[in-house]
């Protein structure tokens, strides 16, 4: 039940990142989120791709061509794994520097969200209470119908469905009413929070010491540094791919030549 209330709070207020302010868990850093997503994505591609290559090599055409794609695929994934390991510290340094530069702004925004959370909590508690009452009322109305079903079994199933339909619609309508009421109650606070965040950004833009232009320049500087530090790792990847591509090229040309000889011999 609390999860429903927390979800509604997120929808009415700040967006997906707001969930970290309404829960006790510490939020992941941007780098942690990027790293986790990239790891899952790359691993999924690697595993599924290897399966496809293995299936192709096991087919009649794959056996005839004998391209040894599976060996090349393993070499390729090893090169990508090495690249990921080399870039890890570099990207971590980039996120650390960026977070340090924006620490003051994030602290001010966190404080605004915490204050707004305190203001809207009574409305969320009231909504949760009303929702629990509606669910309990629905359960009380449905319970006798369940007894009828057990007694009459199949012949009364259709009757039960007909009786449950209006009850379900009633619960839906009453829930919609409570949600609309909650939205109306939270609207001023949502607007206040939006204005506060806009004010923070405007003040940041007008300040001489820490302007948005400064953040943009620093972020660009960090990205340039990241690009420079990544060049050696990318070059290593390119060098690692050359033997793989050359081996694939030789195997393919050999297979085509063999196929051409067989066609000419027929």
UniProtKB/Swiss-Prot annotation:
Sorted UniProt keywords? Cholesterol metabolism, Glycoprotein, HDL, Lipid metabolism, Lipid transport, Lipoprotein, Oxidation, Palmitate, Phosphoprotein, Repeat, Secreted, Signal, Steroid metabolism, Sterol metabolism, Transport
GO CC list: chylomicron; endocytic vesicle; extracellular vesicle; low-density lipoprotein particle; spherical high-density lipoprotein particle; very-low-density lipoprotein particle
Give the molecular function GO annotations.
Answer: amyloid-beta binding; apolipoprotein A-I receptor binding; chemorepellent activity; cholesterol binding; cholesterol transfer activity; enzyme binding; heat shock protein binding; high-density lipoprotein particle binding
Q: Mind telling me how this protein is modified after translation?
A: Glycosylated. Palmitoylated.
Q: Which GO terms describe its biological process?
A: adrenal gland development; amyloid-beta formation; blood vessel endothelial cell migration; cellular response to lipoprotein particle stimulus; cholesterol biosynthetic process; cholesterol efflux; cholesterol homeostasis; cholesterol import
What tissues harbor this protein? Major protein of plasma HDL, also found in chylomicrons.
Instruction: Extract the signal peptide range.
Output: 1-18
Q: Does the keyword Amino-acid biosynthesis apply?
A: no
Which family does this protein fall into?
Belongs to the apolipoprotein A1/A4/E family.
UniProt function note:
Participates in the reverse transport of cholesterol from tissues to the liver for excretion by promoting cholesterol efflux from tissues and by acting as a cofactor for the lecithin cholesterol acyltransferase (LCAT). As part of the SPAP complex, activates spermatozoa motility.
Task: Please report the name of this protein according to its UniProt entry.
Answer: Apolipoprotein A-I
Species this protein is from: Carlito syrichta (Philippine tarsier)
């Amino acid at each position: 039940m609390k999860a429903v209330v927390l979800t509604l709070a997120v929808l009415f207020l700040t967006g997906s990142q707001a969930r970290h302010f309404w829960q006790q868990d510490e939020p992941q850093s941007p780098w942690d989120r990027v790293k986790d997503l990239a790891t899952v994505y790359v691993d999924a591609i690697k595993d599924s791709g290897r399966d496809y290559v293995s299936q192709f090599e096991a087919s009649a055409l794959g056996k005839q061509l004998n391209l040894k794609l599976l060996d090349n695929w393993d070499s390729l994934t090893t090169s990508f794994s090495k690249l990921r390991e080399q870039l890890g510290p570099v990207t971590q340094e980039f996120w650390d520097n960026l977070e340090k530069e924006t620490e003051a702004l994030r602290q001010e925004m966190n404080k605004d969200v915490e204050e707004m959370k305190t203001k809207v909590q009574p409305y969320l508690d009231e909504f949760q209470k009303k929702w629990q009452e509606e669910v309990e009322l629905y359960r009380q109305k449905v319970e006798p119908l369940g007894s009828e079903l057990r007694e009459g079994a199949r012949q009364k199933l259709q009757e039960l469905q007909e009786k449950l339909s209006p009850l379900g619609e009633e619960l839906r309508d009453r829930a919609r009413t409570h949600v609309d009421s909650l939205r109306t109650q939270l609207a001023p606070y949502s607007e206040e929070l939006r204005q506060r965040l806009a004010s923070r950004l405007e003040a940041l833009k007008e300040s001489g010491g820490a302007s948005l232009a400064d953040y943009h320049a620093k972020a660009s500087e960090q990205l340039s540094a990241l690009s420079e530090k990544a060049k050696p790792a990318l070059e290593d990847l390119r060098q690692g791919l050359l033997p793989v591509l050359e081996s694939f090229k030789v195997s393919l040309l050999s297979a085509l030549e063999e196929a051409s000889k067989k066609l000419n011999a027929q």
